[in-house]
C-alpha cells in the first residue's frame, strides 16, 4: 500500500524584490509525519518533488546529506519570484526504505551548497586518503569507502571517514556520506571521526562477518578499532562502536592497511610502512607485536600478483603526482624483491593504490590524475612473470560534485565565446584547467576538466621552475583570471601564483577557440627582472619561511589579483599586494610609441586613510590572500572582494571613490543569512560575479580539495533566512 503525501509550505516573512533569487531551506521530518498520520509504510527519499502552488510548476530542488542517515532533513530550492509564497513538498511512502539514489539534476541554491556537474551522465568522484571497495549495507554491491581531507560543504564536519554507496551494476555511486560511530553499544549519540589528516582501512577484525574500521589520526602514535555493531541508522548505514586503541607508528598521511601479511589466518596491520603483527591466534582482540619496518615505502597495499600464493606489495616510488605504480615480489617472510613495473596501461600519475575486489574480480583501486579520479583495475593474469592489470571502471556519480584536486581557485568566464559561463580553475600541483559548460547559464552541464595548452604542451606553473629553486614547497597555487590584458579583444590567461611573479599567456587564437603563446612574466617599471633575479628570489625562501620579504620584486607571494580598469582610462589594471604586503594598484598605460607598459601607481586606501592589508580585519597569520574586482552594489564602480586564508573570511570593500581614483569603504564581512562564512583554512579565494543568472553578483568559493560552495547575492545581503510555516500533511492512497 503506497500513499502520495503533500506538506504545504508558506513563506511568512517579507521578501526583498531587488536581491535576485532567494534560497529557501525547509527542515522536514518525513518519518514523523508518516507516523503521526498513522500511515503504513515508510518514507521514500527519492520521491520528493517541490511544487510552486502559484505557478503550478515543479521547482528544481536539492536534498541535504541528512537523508543519507535519517528520514528528516532539509529540502532546498530557490524562490525566483518573491510574490510566490506557497509551495508543496510532495513525496510517497514505500513498504521498505529504498537506497538513497543520486538526483539527475541538483540546482544551485546559493546558501553554501556545492557546485555539481549536472551533466545528465555520470562524472568522476574523488577520495583523498585511503580507499577500498566493501559492502557496507549488505546489498551485495561493494561501496566505495575512504577518507576525506579538510573541508567540504560549509557546516559539515571536517575530514572524516566517508562512503559513496554503490547504486548500479556498473561502477557508479551515490552522493558522499559520512560514516559515524558511537562510544558504546546501544547509544544513538552519533559522532564523526576526528582529525584533519586521517587514515582508515576496512575489514572484519572480530570474525562476525561484518566490515569494521581501523582508524588513525595523524601525529597520534596509535590506531583505534571501530566495530560494526550489526545495527543500522534510519538511513540504513551501519553503526560503528569505538573499541580498542593500540600503539602504532603513525606518521603524517602515512598509509594504513589491514592485511594477513604473514599468512597465519588473522589480520595484521601495516602502518606507515611498518608491519604490526597480530599475535592473537583467534584474531580478536588485536594483540600487537613491536612494529617492523618493511623498508619498502609507506603507502603500501598487498595482493598476490603472480599467483604463487604469497601477498606481493604494491606502492609508489614517492609521494605526490607523477608516480607510476610498481610492485615488489614477496620472497617469503617479510622480504620483498626490487620494484618492478606493472603492465596494463596504468596511468603514469598515480597517487594512491589499494587492493580491492569488485565482486569476484580481484584487483586494485588506483587514484590518479592529480588526486581527481579513482579507477578499478582487475588483475588479469601474469604472463612471463609480469602481472597485468586491466581497467574496468572509473568511479563516477550522476550527481557528482565538481571536485578538482588541491586548491583549484575558481574564475568563471565565457572561455569559448558561446555565451555561457565556463569555469577556469588553478591548482596546487601547477596545472590550470578549464571546465566547459555544455548546458546553459540557467541549467549548466559541465564537462570534466581539461588541461590548457601553450605551444602544444600543458601549462604548468611550479615554484621551482619559475625560481630555479629546490624548495620543499614546490607548488603552483595559481589564481587564474581570463581577461583581455593586451587590449586585442581576446581573453588572455593571467596567473598570479605561489611565487612573487605573475605569469601570463597571450591568446593567439580566436574568441571561440582560445590558443596560447609562450609564458610571459609581467614586468613593472622600476623593477628589472631576469632569470638571475628570479633565481635570487628562489634562494631567499627557506624551509621555515617560503614567502620571504623580497624588496626588489613588485609583487608578494601567493596572492590573487583583482583585474579591472581601476583608473578609467580603458586599459586593464589590477590590484594585488606589493612587496610590502599592501594592496597596490598596478596600472597600464601607453608610452609615446603606443606600447603598453605597466607601472606601480601606488597603495590603495580605505576611506579613513589606512592602507589595505590584513591588519584591517585583525588577522594574525600572514599568508595567502586574494583580491577580486566586481561591482557588488550596482553603482557603476568596481568594488574589491578581499579574502584571507587561516580565517577563511571574505570581505567587501566598497568603492566610495570614483572610477578614476578608487577609495574603499571599511571592510564588511560577508555572512550567509547573518552567519559567518569562514569554511576553509587555505582559501576561499572566491570568484565574484553573477553565477546564477539573476543579474546580481554572487560568490563562488573553494576549499582545500576544491569543491565549490556557492553563495548567492540574496543570502549574503539578508540578515536571516526566509521564515516559513510548515502545515499538516495531507495524503491519498495510490
Question: Can you describe what each PLM-predicted range is?
Answer:
Residues 1-114:
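Alpha-mannosidase-like glycoside hydrolase catalytic domains involved in N-glycan trimming
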Residues 102-125, 165-195, 227-251, 277-296, ...:
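Blade-edge motifs of beta-propeller repeat domains
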Residues 423, 685-734:
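Blade-level signature of beta-propeller repeat domains, shared across WD40, Kelch, NHL, RCC1
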Residues 138-148, 207-217, 263-272, 307-316, ...:
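Acidic/hydrophobic-patterned starts of short beta strands in beta-sheet-rich repeat architectures
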Residues 120-151:
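Beta-strand-rich domains and repeat architectures in extracellular enzymes and scaffolds
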Residues 128-136, 196-205, 253-261, 298-305, ...:
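Beta-propeller blade termini
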Residues 218-221, 244, 248-261, 265-276, ...:
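Solenoidal tandem-repeat scaffolds enriched in leucines and small polar residues
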